[in-house]
Amino acid sequence: ATVKESSLITPEGSEAEIRNIVLSVGDAADFGFSVGQSIGVVVPGPHEFGQSEHFRLYTVANMATNGSGDEIEICVKRCSYIDEFSGEKHAGVASHYLCDRQPGDEIIVTGPYGLPFTLPEEKTADLLMIGLGTGIAPFRAFVRHLYEHLGGWDGRVRLFYGAKSGLEMAYMNDRQNDFEMYYDEATFKAFTAVSPR
């Protein structure tokens, strides 16, 4: 896949760096991706602990926004972790690799993985989605699918989303608010919560 765009979706000054990364994958239909599935990202090595490559799954945040069917988007937070034994801080291998990619860079993707979201047969059924942090990614694709590809949903659609701070509300902050476009849909409501833990 080729990186087409990597845009910061958290405001400057936010403790978290969260990026929306657009990948050109040829024809996404050839991959057979469905809303709710993940792609695998292979990070070439060698790595700190001797692995020849590192593998990480990312849920597809959106598909084919350009109308040609060749793009998918993923939501990536630059992560670090503390080694339990040494107390040392280590950079997340895949998240740092992806956040450092520039347009035109090639990356290895595999997939799809996981089961797609299944909708109830009746469009009058209520839908409840709960996500935290970058866990909002699959719901972004799902809500867009409901209202843009299926022509709407008659049941109540509720999204509950939380983050450590308002600055970390991916796709729901001053820099980017994708869900705002669905607020005029009679059946959609989004609720946010902030918790420092």
What kind of region is each of these model predictions?
Residues 2-102:
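Ferredoxin-reductase
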Residues 92-197:
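FNR/FR-type flavoprotein reductase catalytic core
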